[in-house]
Amino acid sequence: TLMRSSAASDVYKRQIYIESFVLREIMKKIYLSEVDSTNLYAKSNIENLADKSIVHAANQTAGRGRLQRTWVNLGEGNLFLTFVLKPSNSFNEVYSNLTQYLSVVLCKILEEYGLKPQIKWPNDVLINGKKIAGILSETVMQGSLFKGLVLGIGVNLNTSEKDLASIIDKEATSLNLEISKSVDVNLFLDKLAEEFFADYDNFLQKGFELIKNDYISRTCFLDTEICVQVFNDKKCGIAKAINDKGELVMSNNQKEFVLTIGDIL
């Protein structure tokens, strides 16, 4: 009797554990019908969000890109997502490569659709030379205290050509236009999150080295003459290489220089 009771108790405890585990996993995914920006929401609520949480919105009204650019709102049916990351170390140089890691993850998923995406350094993802996604990483501090990182991504999944025409400054595309059918946002989100976290912990240990070959093999504009906007400055020259830190190595008049940030024009 005691043995049967003990066994029953173990089964009960295991069931409670499974239920609490499932609940914990569900709680890690925050869904919002509309938000100004998933990154802003994540930053404002980071104290209450667990490590590896996901903030997903059906619609985003005030998204931002790198260098404080506005991310044009293309409405529902597209992916607006932020990963909430709270690694134990307050500083790790690999954090600056997280956007590049995510760009490689996204490329691999798009390749499953039969596409050939390219990465425009540092982290824009292009299809046939047209932008399909934007990525932005931000460090969250409270005074001098490190609170975590928010890594946001916007992917055009179901956008009409008319809506894309509203993006005046750059050519853009959407997955549905490239594959000629609509895309299930939730399935795409789940795949992206699964692939992102599959190697995330390994990436924190190894850094850019882990993705270097995958990144460089998909990088466009190498060995061509380009200009890069770096805040209010413009640097022009030949894009020579991507170094071991994920930085862009350029040369001008046989003088090499390295860029850690910028926007290829």
Q: Language model features by range: what are they?
A:
Residues T1-Q15:
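Single conserved hydrophobic/aromatic residue that forms the stacking wall/gate
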Residues L23-R24, S88-F91, N97-P117, I127-L265:
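Long, positively charged amphipathic alpha-helical accessory segments at protein N-termini or as interdomain linkers
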Residues S5-S9, S37, S174:
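Short linear Ser/Thr-Pro motifs
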Residues R14-L115, K131-A133, V140, S182-V183:
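N-terminal lobe of the biotin/lipoate ligase/transferase fold
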Residues S5, E76, N253:
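ATP/adenylate-binding site constellation spanning eukaryotic-like Ser/Thr protein kinases
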